[in-house]
Design a protein with these regions (language model features):
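A conserved regulatory-domain signal marking ACT and ACT-like small-molecule sensing domains
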Residues: 1-117
């Protein structure tokens, strides 16, 4: 069964997510804002919307490493070179409070969504 969800943050930015039910309460996300992605939502996750530029992924991993977050899975998807990209980071442990604010200090990061289990 397919589903679609529209989310809006406090700043009014909208993210549309499309996924499918795998049964037993499990889902797989297959699109974010029309871009093909693939993650299950079985872990705590960060969804980072960013400009496709060098150094952004390094910023993300440094922030997480400095806070002792172990990355279980990490995937990068982009619309096209140099345009909007999406980094999905999944972790076994809960993500630290305020990690979204720290990530947004990078001017190439547009939005961060934290999904806790």
């Amino acid at each position: 069964m397919l589903f679609r969800s529209r989310m809006e943050n406090a700043a009014g930015q909208v993210m549309t997510v499309r996924g499918e039910s795998l049964g037993g309460g499990k889902v797989r996300i297959v699109r974010i804002n029309g871009v093909e992605v693939d993650f299950t939502g079985e872990y705590n996750a960060l969804i980072v919307v960013q400009q496709d530029k060098p150094g952004v992924v390094a910023h993300i991993t440094k922030i997480l490493s400095d806070r002792g977050v172990n990355i279980a899975f990490m995937r990068l998807f982009r619309e096209e070179k140099g345009h909007t990209a999406y980094t999905i980071v999944e972790s076994d442990e809960r993500l630290p409070e305020g990690v979204d604010r720290l990530l947004l200090e990078n001017p190439n990061i547009r939005d961060v969504m934290v999904v806790q289990q």
